[in-house]
Amino acid sequence: DVPKSMQQLLSEYLAKQDIKIEDIIDFHAKFEKIHPFQDGNGRVGRLIMFKECLHHNITPFIIDMNLQPYYYRGLWNYQTGQEKGYLVDTCLTAQDRYSAICSRLVPKQRMADQLATAQEKASAEHTTDRSHPERSGNPVL
């Protein structure tokens, strides 16, 4: 029964004190096995993982197309009780890739912030510079 299974899953998850990435992955695998929706379970489940990572200050991750076959194999292995490590390793690989992308974006954002600050400073200096004839109120002849 889907409602009972979801209630049990949520109760178990919410009872945990210190959520780690393995707990989020475990929740995801169980959520996907319950399959609460007619369509979109995978997208919803991966979105929940992303949100839970952010909520618990864990670097989130996205399963890209290159990792999809490993993700599906890992999910199958996890849900059938064969092994949990394959899915966990796939998610950790995705997390490493996401971190690498973010680390490349942060310096670009800093550079953009520095440029914006420099432009604001230059603009402020330019508008207060009254030595230019057009700014001093004296007409240019």
Residue ranges of predicted features:
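FIC/Doc superfamily catalytic core
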Residues: D1-L141
